């Protein structure tokens, strides 16, 4: 059973009252300390905290995007103009890999780091991790924010075995010898290990592992993909999610498996917006949109209305675990999204449909856009890898094409490729050929 903290059972309306007060303090802090936000908010006519209108009016404020932060960086201030504290108050600086080769830096004060550990511990506890059990993790503790998550396992009181990324032999030796009850990894790596174990005669469903916690990329909440992982591991699969610039792990799924709860409640405020127009979307059962996050109690470099580029589905109905925060499932990244004749298509959604054809297919796919940019002309080419041993029945490509059209309302051209021809990953899968 998962451990539920008292704050997680608090009525959501009460939480919003607390958040409203914290938000007003955060706005005051930004206007006093952040040159970046003084300029951005000032250009929107907000020069005093009262001008912001409170949490109920947050949708009137400008978004913060990654490129805005990058543009504010200088040789003398490589972190960015949103930095609010002197260097001597910073205890940790993480970095994210930059698409241009220039990393982005994420500074934390001691209080910020403590808050990250708190939210991460909540999200991991939701999955059922508890004191005394052995957990093997594959997070890298190097320069990236996942390293901050390691302290969350200490907070939970588990026997934590960090093996890092890129060493499958070491990982599986730890599973064999130390007999953990849980493992933590990306969903792509969990899928890769099913094949790895099968090829080497390792009985993964017969191992000690009873829980697989996946994070780092979308996929763990897709019905067909989750079923594939649970069958291959003989274990319950739940997922967690964070956004490096905001918090390493902010959302965690409980054992009911009906979406990830906001473990970051009290520390971040979540909004839903239309990814194209930026218009607000009400957080209600079944709503879909881009996740936008705002720090509420951050000190080093708080972010206001940060566009995550994660496209999510939301649930606000009661959960059997008693947690009252909204729940989400990540459908995909809006920067991976393609538009085919006006229809938004996420590669992860195509993978989920293809996964319904197991055991005829391996479950691995690669979308191959033909036009530069987001807009694509139909049919959209998709490589689908066959299962090992040639289990496909006649007409498989047509059946997959028809199912995708029925489910996602998009026309595809299915190319069946031999087993083993699509790249596997010990970290995150590439679903789109760029």
PLM segments and residue spans:
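AMP-binding/adenylate-forming catalytic core of the ANL superfamily
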Residues: 183, 292-408, 426-427
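Conserved beta-strand termini and adjacent loop/short-helix elements that scaffold enzyme active sites
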Residues: 163, 240-242, 273, 370, ...
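Active-site phosphate/ATP/adenylate-binding loop shared across adenylate-forming ligases
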Residues: 4-6, 65-238, 246, 250-256, ...
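Short, solvent-exposed loop/turn segments at the edges of secondary structure
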Residues: 207, 264-267, 333
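Nucleotide 5′-phosphate-binding alpha/beta core
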Residues: 1-95, 101-118, 125-126, 226, ...
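Detector for glycine-centered tight turns/loop "hinges" at secondary-structure junctions
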Residues: 101, 201, 277-279, 427
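Conserved AMP-binding/adenylate-forming
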Residues: 220-221, 225-318
């Amino acid at each position: 059973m998962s451990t539920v903290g008292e704050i997680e059972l608090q009525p959501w309306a009460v939480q919003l009252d607390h958040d409203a007060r914290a938000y007003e303090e955060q706005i005051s802090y930004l206007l006093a300390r952040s040159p970046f936000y003084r300029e951005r908010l000032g250009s929107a006519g907000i020069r005093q905290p009262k001008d912001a209108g409170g949490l109920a009016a947050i949708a009137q404020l400008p978004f913060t995007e990654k490129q805005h932060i990058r543009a504010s960086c200088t040789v003398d201030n490589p972190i960015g103009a949103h930095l609010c504290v002197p260097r001597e108050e910073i205890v940790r600086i993480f970095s994210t890999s930059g698409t241009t080769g220039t990393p982005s830096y994420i500074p934390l004060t001691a209080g910020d780091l403590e808050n990250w550990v708190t939210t991460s511990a909540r999200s991991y506890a939701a999955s059922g991790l508890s004191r005394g059990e052995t957990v093997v993790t594959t997070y890298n503790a190097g320069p990236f924010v996942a390293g901050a998550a390691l302290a969350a396992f200490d907070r939970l009181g588990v026997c934590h075995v960090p093996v890092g990324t890129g060493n499958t032999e070491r990982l599986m030796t730890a599973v064999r010898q130390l007999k953990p009850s849980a493992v933590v990894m990306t969903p792509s790596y969990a899928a890769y290990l099913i094949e790895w174990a099968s090829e080497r005669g390792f009985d993964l469903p017969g191992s000690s592992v009873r829980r697989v916690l996946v994070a780092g990329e979308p996929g763990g909440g897709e019905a067909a993909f989750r079923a594939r992982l649970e069958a291959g591991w003989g274990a319950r699969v739940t997922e967690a999610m964070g956004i490096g610039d905001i918090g390493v792990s902010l959302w965690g799924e409980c054992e009911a498996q009906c979406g990830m709860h906001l473990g970051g409640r009290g520390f971040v405020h979540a909004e839903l917006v239309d990814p194209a127009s930026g218009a607000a979307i009400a957080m209600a059962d079944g709503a879909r949109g881009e996740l936008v996050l705002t720090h509420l109690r951050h000190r080093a470099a708080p972010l206001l209305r940060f566009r995550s580029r994660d496209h999510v589905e939301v649930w606000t109905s009661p959960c059997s675990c008693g947690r009252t925060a909204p729940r989400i499932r990540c459908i995909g990244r809006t920067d991976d999204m393609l538009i085919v004749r006006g229809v938004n298509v996420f590669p992860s959604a195509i993978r989920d449909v293809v996964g319904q054809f197991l055991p005829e297919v391996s479950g691995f796919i690669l979308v191959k856009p033909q036009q530069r940019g987001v807009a694509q002309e139909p049919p959209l080419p998709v490589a689908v890898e066959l299962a090992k041993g040639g289990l496909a029945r006649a007409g498989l490509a047509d059946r997959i094409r028809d199912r995708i059209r029925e489910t996602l309302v998009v026309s595809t051209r299915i190319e069946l490729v031999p087993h083993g021809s699509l790249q596997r990953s010990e970290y995150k899968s590439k679903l789109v050929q760029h």
